[in-house]
Amino acid sequence: MSDYKHTLNLPETEFPMRGDLAKREPNMLKRWYDQDLYGAIRRAKAGKPSFILHDGPPYANGSIHIGHSVNKILKDVIIKSKGLSGFDSPYVPGWDCHGLPIELKVEGMVGKPGEKVSAAEFRAECRKYAKTQIEAQKTDFIRLGVLGDWEHPYLTMDFGTEANIIRSMAKIVENGHLHKGSKPVHWCTDCGSALAEAEVEYYDKNSPSIDVRFKAVDEATVAAKFDCPEGHLGKGPISAVIWTTTPWTLPANRAIAMHADLDYALVQVEGEHPERLILAAELVKDVMDRAGIEKFHNLGYTKGVALELLRFNHPFYSFDVPVVLGDHVTLDAGTGAVHTAPGHGQEDFVVGQKYGLEVANPVGSNGVYLPDTELFAGQHVFKANAAVVEVLTERGALLHHMVFNHSYPHCWRHKTPIIFRATPQWFISMEQKGLRQRALEEIERIEKDGITQHGQSGWVPAWGKNRIQAMVENRPDWCISRQRTWGVPISLFVHKETQQLHPESVRLMHEVAKRVEQSGIQAWWDLDKAELLGSDADMYDKVPDTLDVWFDSGSTHSSVVDARPEFNGHSADLYLEGSDQHRGWFMSSLMIGVAMKDKAPYNQVLTHGFTVDGQGRKMSKSIGNVVSPQDVMNKLGADILRLWVASTDYTGEMTVSDEILKRSADAYRRIRNTARFLLANLNGFNPATDMVAAADMVVVDRWAVGRAKAAQAEIVTAFEEYNFHGVTQKLMQFCSIEMGSFYLDVIKDRQYTAKADSLARRSCQTALYHIAQAMVRWMAPIMSFTADEIWALLPGERSEFVFTEEWYDGLFGLDAGEQMDDAFWAEILTVRGEVNKALEAARGEKRIGGSLQAELTLFAKPELAERLNALADELRFVLLTSKAKVVTADTAPEGSVATERADLWLSVAQSAAAKCDRCWHHVEDVGTIAGHEEICGRCATNVEGDGETRQFA
């Protein structure tokens, strides 16, 4: 018996079945950096149209978490896909380096500035600490397979960037957007500093809920405002009742706010101690119920506007306050009368400005009442709530008191409740130069330009537009000053007496920036005023405040994008961050961009959701559901993490767990196995000498290349639309359905048994080569390590890295109108599906073993029969049976099996023919060929003759 194994073209490749990514990826990374892959990409893309994704800087503190990984991987997928689309798309990663979290870490190590160390030494320690954090994070980001200029990232603490931040501020001053004022701002008493909107988080908190009487100064005048029947003005003192959940703010009360258009009732409380209360008419019953007052009736009604400027006594101080009118007063809760402390609330401040009220702030930066605060000096405000209630009770001003659970603002860093506190601060005005209106116009422009240029809103997903629009419409002036040590100085000089800015502030800021560029922000604190101000130095103070860190990052479109040579003067095409950045980086960048240049700094904004566990819960160490990117990379490899990110719809919450990552690993294996089949069957193929022209190829091979062409069109469009889960779905469908369950199955016989250098086999290899060339590029932005591995094993001449390439342009398909066009093969696929079901049933009945034991008869109506017969004897190769006979039939013949097609019936029988030892087909001529008794005539031709001819499959 002869051994024909050596005559077969068995698949062979160095591409292993197991990816073993966790072990092998680090070696690939080393090669990328040893061979300067990022530089190679830049050189290959030089002169191409630019696409700039500007990196929103993560904060330089702590290890990266799964959310960081999602963000960086999404950016990397876009950058790499843009390179493949023919763009020069440099990626400069950055870090946010100033601010409170680093200060707190350094305080824990060296103490507070001015105590054990000087402020200058403290800043130096902050700079040193930030550097160590950046290096640790950078290592993890690189391990993710993210390509960028990691050797030259931008840091907001780079001297040049610090200087450019000051220059950005100077431009805003020049454009007239800056003003100083005493306004209530979010204030953390633990930080001792103002907080930005984005640094505020909301948690449930128990607070005292109190209803408080403010007695009328002139009861007769007040009563006369109500339409009470003559002689029925009631009896007892008259009080307006306010409701508040912040009793500690009552020392700063300067008014009672009512709504001009609401109906107010004068309510007679009956009983032993009668009194008259002013309440919103719709809320009378609610207030009486919670106060436990059963006997009462309404004496009369009036509109809020009638009560404007009437005076009421403060409940425990010896002054009176007016009624003011404000649209912020609602009937959602309370009494319809709002306690107004302009120093402790944004709406209170606005209405206070309208009426010229004092902006009282009796609270120090540490949350303790100032020494001159009557009754409460030296008490912390949150502890003083009980003391305020006690005083109100003693004075007979407390109508009702209970504990109330509600959502309350907390410091993002300390997780402790914060306060609104009026302090002298520097603000970027939303109104004085029309910043709010222009920002809203830019939000609209981004949406419309996106639709015009890309067919979809510039806000991705589209709801992002409404979100940031509402925030801009309602946001207060931006408080940009902070009372911190580690930050970029505001770099202003103010007149000691008038508190006015120096008339040459813009020029002076540019002078300061020059010095900061040389030696960093410490240059400001080391600066002798006289050096810049000359003889005027004694008349001016240096402003000690630093800039809000959101100004640092929000100005990077100017301090970094405008300054870096690789961006070549282009503005950013895309900003991409988590959904919390509508009020964070997207907002600060928009405000600064419009304030500086009258234009948003981005053309598109993409938002991704937060990561949650398999049950939809936030990641939490206490719950034990944290998925660490480092663990995933060390166990499964970065490509699995990257595939999970790309496969997940980022527009909502992104669910991740060990089970979900296992599913990603399974999907990865299917893709890898397809790639392995392609490479293994390209063994011995030299595209320079063995490539077959499209016109000479076997029809099914051209069909397969055409499927790759169609898939590529969908995949490239999905990449352009940032629809990455659409990319992975199409890739999986292509590998599993079009290739795995049909084409790769069909070609095995021809690939393994045909003559090695025959047209039949080279046609197949030509198709596999084109498909591999295309598919490796589809994979490259997502499974970058695996794509690099495949690229290195492709036959023929090629560049060093797939990442310097563009989408493969060597694909072609079947011509429309050909007899065997795409529609023909689509129908063949449905027929094959029915055949597979019939073969499976026969296997289940033990009538056949493998499909090659089957002889198949297809009873088909004339039209289908004609199409099936077009494949002639090659139909059996398509259906993977040893024999396939087509019989024309109008109805189901006896003994046939019906299919889901109305024009097809099937009959499966076991072949009586002998099995060929080489191709395993059961063929009548086995045993009839002299010298080759164990094989069929077709195999004998392939072994010793000219080789078989294939036209169709």
UniProtKB/Swiss-Prot annotation:
Any Gene Ontology CC annotation: cytosol
Keywords carried by this UniProt record: Aminoacyl-tRNA synthetase, ATP-binding, Cytoplasm, Ligase, Metal-binding, Nucleotide-binding, Protein biosynthesis, Zinc
Binding positions (L-isoleucyl-5'-AMP): 577
Positions of short motif 'KMSKS' region: 618-622
Gene Ontology terms: biological process: isoleucyl-tRNA aminoacylation
Domain comment quoted from the record: IleRS has two distinct active sites: one for aminoacylation and one for editing. The misactivated valine is translocated from the active site to the editing site, which sterically excludes the correctly activated isoleucine. The single editing site contains two valyl binding pockets, one specific for each substrate (Val-AMP or Val-tRNA(Ile)).
HAMAP family given in the database record: Ile_tRNA_synth_type1
Name listed for the protein in its UniProt record: Isoleucine--tRNA ligase
Organism: Aeromonas salmonicida (strain A449)
Lineage per the UniProt record: Bacteria, Pseudomonadati, Pseudomonadota, Gammaproteobacteria, Aeromonadales
